[in-house]
Structure formats: structure tokens, C-alpha cells
Regions:
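Short, conserved recognition motifs on repeat-domain binding surfaces
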Residues: 1-250
């Protein structure tokens, strides 16, 4: 765990769950637990048709396993396409694919430590059936949960971006959709506070206004090292504590 504000990091104790040969992918998410003024890390390990989860708590410096219980119960978890979780509205979110049902958003409430389903918009499945989906990801656009999909056109020289915004959190009927044409997108890194998309295209890393389609090329020459761009907030977390080190220590 690293706090860039004070340039200190903490080596975490080893997790309980191991990534065995049959494990398919690993997902992490970090969240602030407001009720206890604490931080938690969610770790999901997916296997062939199932998944396990564990939570690290900063105050106790320990991991413990949590059970994934969903209503209706999901028996077959096939794949989680992203390696990180999005923190929004007190919960961590990730897209989940199931072997026996349509994909959905898996949310983990940091306060009560319960998993819940948030269904993807119905119109997305129509897009998925008729389109070549290149990227699908979660983001926060102007305070609302958003589901963003980038599709390639047949010529693979251009594409389209579909954006669904959940106007009322957790309410399936509140998904609203907007589709805009755009040049081929190579990668997506999230959204800025004002709702612009951070994407990589043929010109490099750009910030794109999906309403006006105005693009601003960012002063980052090579985005290959980038994987995820969360919002930053200054904090004194890790100022004191066990196993905390400075960036400048040998």
C-alpha cells in the first residue's frame, strides 16, 4: 500500500488465498471505510467456474476470507475481465461474467461486507450481440456509475463508444445510454472529474469530451506503462504504523 502524498508505503502481510495453477485471474480494489475511518482491500481470485474473496483491513493488518453470497445465488463465475475494482458510493465494483447467466456488475459494500448484483442495461446485450466489443469498463461520470463500451466497426479503422449512466444508483431502469462515433480506441483509463474520457488512440493519450468530441492530447508521450487512473486525495494514512517505509530508504 502506497501513499503518494507523504511518499510512504507499507508492505502487506501475505494474503490467505493462493493463486493456484487453475486460477484464471486476480482482481484487487481498495476502499475507504468511512464508518471506522479505516481502509480495506478486496481481493478476488477466480478459478474455472467459481471465485473466492478475502479482505485486508489496515487497522488490523490482516486478511480474512469473506463468502460471496448473492441473491439469486450465482453458482458459476466464469471470468472477471478487469484486474481492478471501481470504488463508488461506498462499494467496490467490477464486471463479472457467468457461465450460465448474463454478465452483471458485482458490488462489495465496504460497510456491511456483503456482495450484491447490479444488472447491466438490457440494451447492452443487444450491442454485444451485433458488435465487435473491444473494451468494456466501469467508471464514474459526474458522480454517477457508468458502464462504457468501445466497439470496432467492420473496417477496424473506426469505432463507436456506448456510454450507459446509472442516474439512480442500484436502479436498473435508471440506465441511460448515449452512443458516439470515434476513432479506434486502443485503451481506456477512466474518467476525469468533469466526465471526460481518458483514452489512448493513434495520437497518444488524450482526454476526450464525449459530448462535444473535443480531444485534448495529454503531455504523456508513452502510455504503455499505464494500467489504471484513479482519483487522488491527499491523506496522512501510513504516516505512522508498523512496517511503514519511506520511498527514500534503502
Amino acid at each position: 500500500m502506497w501513499n503518494p502524498s507523504i511518499r510512504k508505503f507499507k508492505n502487506l502481510v501475505l494474503p490467505c488465498l493462493t493463486c493456484r495453477i487453475e486460477s484464471k485471474n486476480l482482481v484487487h480494489g481498495i476502499a475507504y471505510h468511512s464508518q471506522n475511518n479505516d481502509f480495506k482491500i478486496l481481493r478476488l481470485v477466480t478459478y474455472e467456474l467459481w471465485a473466492k474473496a478475502e479482505v485486508y483491513t489496515l487497522s488490523t493488518d490482516s486478511w480474512r476470507e469473506v463468502v460471496i453470497e448473492l441473491e439469486p445465488q450465482t453458482r458459476f463465475i466464469d471470468h472477471i475481465p478487469e484486474s481492478y475494482c471501481l470504488f463508488h458510493n461506498g462499494a467496490l465494483h467490477t464486471i463479472l461474467n457467468s457461465a450460465v447467466e448474463r454478465g452483471y456488475i458485482l458490488s462489495f459494500d465496504v460497510n456491511d461486507e456483503r456482495f450484491r448484483k447490479i444488472m447491466l442495461p438490457q440494451s447492452y446485450f443487444d450491442v454485444a450481440f451485433y458488435s465487435d466489443i473491444h473494451i468494456k469498463s466501469l467508471a464514474v461520470i459526474k458522480g454517477s456509475l457508468a458502464f462504457i463500451v468501445f466497439c470496432n466497426n467492420i473496417d477496424r479503422l473506426s469505432g463507436k463508444c456506448h456510454i450507459w449512466v446509472m442516474r439512480e444508483y442500484g436502479v436498473l431502469e435508471s440506465w441511460t445510454r448515449k452512443s458516439v462515433p470515434m476513432d479506434l480506441v486502443q485503451d481506456f483509463y477512466g474518467c476525469t472529474d468533469n466526465g471526460e474520457l481518458l483514452i489512448e488512440n493513434a495520437t497518444g493519450l488524450v482526454s476526450l469530451d464525449h459530448e462535444s468530441l473535443n480531444a485534448n492530447k495529454l503531455a504523456i508521450e508513452d502510455a504503455q506503462w499505464m494500467a489504471y487512473t484513479p482519483n487522488s486525495m491527499e491523506s496522512l494514512v501510513l504516516l505512522d504504523g508498523l512496517n511503514v517505509s519511506s520511498e527514500y530508504e534503502d
